[in-house]
Amino acid sequence: MNIIQQLEKEQFDKLSATKTIPEFGPGDTVIVNVKVVEGERTRVQAYEGVCIGRSGGGLNESFTVRKISYGEGVERVFPVMSPMIDSIKVVRRGKVRRAKLYYLRKLRGKSARIVEKKTDRAAATN
């Protein structure tokens, strides 16, 4: 293990102790609360959309969230360990068979919907 990997691992461990990141993947609908700086004030802005992919690993990991705003598709890439991310919440799990959902960029309307993943009721009650 070289020095850079060792430093990244130390930073990742330090940030992981303070931040709780839920398990989510492509197809999941997430709400990302982002800290926005406006002049001297900072506020938290919620960004809700479908996670269309995750890339990287460790300290350099990021994920892309896509939403439709006023009929226009908007994508935003968030670093997982960014200090600008206040929290991440998973709203619903999606049933997909791909790691990258870039094909959603071409789809409109009902065809762009993702089926919700069914959870096993027996496992949920125990």
Curated annotation (Swiss-Prot):
GO BP term, pick one: translation
- Keyword Mitochondrion in annotation: no
The record's annotation in Pfam families points to: Ribosomal_L19 (PF01245)
Q: Which domain of life is it from?
A: Bacteria
Offer an example of a GO molecular function term for this protein.
Answer: structural constituent of ribosome
Which UniProt keywords are listed?
Ribonucleoprotein, Ribosomal protein
> Record's GO cellular component, any one?
cytosolic large ribosomal subunit
| HAMAP family, A to Z | Ribosomal_bL19
The entry's family comment says: Belongs to the bacterial ribosomal protein bL19 family.
Q: What does this protein do?
A: This protein is located at the 30S-50S ribosomal subunit interface and may play a role in the structure and function of the aminoacyl-tRNA binding site.
**What is this protein identified as?**
Large ribosomal subunit protein bL19
